[in-house]
Amino acid sequence: MDTSLAEEVQHTAATLQSDSFFFMSPYRSFTTSGCFARFSEPAVGGDDPAGQFQQKLAQAFLNAKTNGIAHPVMVGAIPFDTRKPSSLFIPQRWQTFSRPARQQSARYFSGSQALKVEQRTEIPPQPVFEEMVARAASLTATPQVNKVVLSRLIDIATDKHIDSGALMERLIAQNPASFNFHVPLEDGGVLLGASPELLLRKEGAHFSSLPLAGSARRQPDDVLDREAGNKLLASEKDRHEHDLVTQAMKAILAPRSHHLSMPSSPQLITTPTLWHLATPVEGDARDNENALTLACLLHPTPALSGFPHEAAKELIAELEPFDRELFGGIVGWCDSEGNGEWVVTIRCARLHKNTVRLFAGAGIVPASSPVGEWRETGVKLSTMLNVFGLH
């Protein structure tokens, strides 16, 4: 990798202001400055090209162009529950930068220094989470629900204000192949993360998605690591969980697209800590679709809620002792031409002054083990814990 390129990306992340949006992707990477207008319209109904959300989005783009922003983009985050306000805005300016080579970028970034933790709280505690999983697993064996995704949080209070720009520098170093994001929030906080999961990318008429469901922990030994991946690929439990996601997405996208294609079997992808089952989905959208109509059509996928969605959503509300807010939502951007890219808000943290909230979830099916799901969510949480220098 070119040293000047690595230094450019490092500088971009390290000098990031808390009010800047930053998005790093194989497709388009850019950062913003200034805020022309915030957009808090709930995204419920956002899949309807003629609905209120899309009409207000079009008006926001028109206002930006009228005020001299030639190529406006809408950036930010949409919550898990689309009835809640969105955290979107049109920036005054945005600038693209080259994404560093995936396999070489980390060596150009400085190491991390552990934060001093004043308080750490697991929400819910392990015994309660395992009870939640056991309850959900028993219910997924009934006709009412096939899968539900349950999540947990870690709240951390530190001894000083947390520098989100420095954290982004380390996040990119440790997760160079992820979709890395930094979203400024209206309360002065920041949502940042390293998502492995592409919900929807659209350029022109063509769109793609890469849903993930089913995971296994990476191993330090190369032989054992490959065995872990092969075991995941052969796992009946994980293949079932994954198939629920892909078949639901196929049913949702088919009426709104041309030439929809996906392979019959999943493939393996990796993050620094996990193997995942993944299935690439591609198609051509109908004329009245844009990146956000399709993203809202898919969100939340069964990988984040469960299946069927309404039954899973009710079970999540019953069992989880917190509001997910932006966790399990989507982060990304779209432009006035209908292009855009949205990723699932996982492997992430919400920062505010000296506090951090981390989130991780796991798909529960009849074969799920309560202690196994606690461990799986722990591995997922390690992505962000490592960024903070915590374990």
Model-derived segments and their meaning:
Residues 1-52, 155-161, 165:
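Short Lys/Arg-enriched alpha/beta "domain-start" segment
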Residues 19, 72-78, 148, 180-184, ...:
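A short glycine-rich, hydrophobically flanked beta-strand micro-motif that places a catalytic Asp/Glu
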Residues 23-40, 157-240, 257-260, 338-361:
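An anion-binding catalytic pocket shared by soluble metabolic enzymes
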Residues 32-34, 39-44, 95-127, 133-134, ...:
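Contiguous alpha-helical scaffold segments within structured protein domains
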Residues 49-158, 162-163, 258, 389:
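Non-catalytic accessory segments adjacent to catalytic cores
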Residues 76, 143, 200, 247, ...:
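A residue-level signal for conserved active-site and pocket-lining positions in enzyme catalytic cores
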Residues 153-154, 185-191, 249-251, 266-273, ...:
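A glycine-rich phosphate-binding loop feature that marks nucleotide/adenosyl-phosphate handling sites
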Residues 280-391:
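Conserved hydrophobic core element of enzyme catalytic domains
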